Regions:
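Multi-pass alpha-helical transmembrane bundle typical of ion/small-solute transporters
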Residues: 1-238
C-alpha cells in the first residue's frame, strides 16, 4: 500500500494505531509548549491560539514526515533545532512570568501572533526528532500519515489547553515546562548524528547534562528577572 491507496485491512489498522500511538508518545513536549504559549495570551484568545497554532503544526508535520529521509541527511539540523528550543523556552518564560495579565491583554494581538509562531516553531524543531519513527510506521502511505495526525493532534491540543489552565493556577509550572523544553533541546543537540559521531558520549552523560541544562535555563531566567526588578527599583521614577 503506497501513496493515496488504502484498504481497511488488519495491516492498515495496525499501522494506523502505531502512527497514532507514536505521535502521542512523542508529543508530550509539544503539549507543554502549546500550554505555555496559550497561557501567554488573554483567555478569550486561547482557543484560537491553540486551533491556529495546532492546525499549522499538523500541516507542517505532514510535510516534514513526507520528506523525513531528506531532512535526516542535513548535517547539524537536529542540533540547530535543539538550540532554537532554548530560545523558545526563554521567550515563553518572558511572556508567562515577565508580563502581568493587564500587559497580556494590552498586547493581546502581538502575543497572539507570537504564541502561534512559537507553537509552530517548537513543533517543527521537536518533530525533527519524531519524523523517522512516524515515517517508518506509515510505509509511504500519505493516508495513514494524515489519519494518524488528525487523531493525535486534537488530543494534543486538548492537553495543551488543560496545561494552560494549570499554569494560570500554578505559575511555577512555567519553570517546569521551560526545564522540560531545555532538556529536550540539549538532548537533540547531543544526539545529532554529526555531534554524536565526534563526541561519543554515553546515554547517561547526555541525560545528566540535559537535566543540568533543564535546571540552568530557568535558574538563569529567575536571576535575570530579579536583577531587572532590583535595577528598576533603584531607578528614579519620572
Amino acid at each position: 500500500m503506497t501513496g493515496l491507496e488504502f484498504s481497511w485491512s488488519w495491516d492498515f489498522i495496525v499501522r494506523f494505531l502505531s502512527i497514532t500511538l507514536i505521535d502521542l508518545a512523542l508529543s508530550g513536549d509539544n503539549a507543554i509548549v502549546i500550554g505555555m504559549a496559550a497561557a501567554s495570551v488573554p483567555r478569550e484568545r486561547r482557543k484560537w491560539t491553540i486551533v491556529f497554532g495546532g492546525g499549522l503544526a499538523i500541516l507542517l508535520r505532514i510535510v516534514l514526515t513526507s520528506i523525513a529521509t531528506l531532512l535526516m541527511q542535513i548535517p547539524l539540523l537536529s542540533a540547530v533545532g535543539g538550540g532554537v528550543l532554548f530560545w523558545v523556552a526563554w521567550k515563553l518564560l518572558r511572556v508567562d512570568i515577565g508580563e502581568s495579565e493587564e500587559e497580556k491583554v494590552a498586547k493581546g494581538a502581538q502575543n497572539f501572533r507570537q504564541a502561534i509562531f512559537l507553537i509552530v516553531t517548537a513543533d517543527f524543531m521537536m518533530s525533527l526528532d519524531n519524523v523517522i519513527a512516524v515515517a517508518g510506521s506509515a510505509h509511504g502511505s500519505i493516508v495513514l500519515l494524515i489519519a494518524g495526525l488528525l487523531i493525535s493532534m486534537p488530543l494534543l491540543m486538548t492537553t495543551g489547553g488543560a496545561i494552560s489552565l494549570l499554569i494560570d493556577k500554578f505559575k511555577w509550572l512555567v519553570f517546569v515546562g521551560a526545564a522540560i523544553i531545555s532538556f529536550t533541546g540539549t538532548r537533540m543537540i547531543f544526539e545529532d548524528k554529526f555531534i554524536e559521531s565526534r563526541l561519543h558520549l554515553s546515554s547517561l552523560v547526555i541525560i545528566v547534562v540535559s537535566i543540568l541544562m533543564g535546571i540552568i535555563l530557568p535558574a538563569v531566567f529567575i536571576w535575570f528577572n530579579r536583577r531587572k526588578a532590583r535595577l528598576a527599583a533603584k531607578s528614579p521614577s519620572l
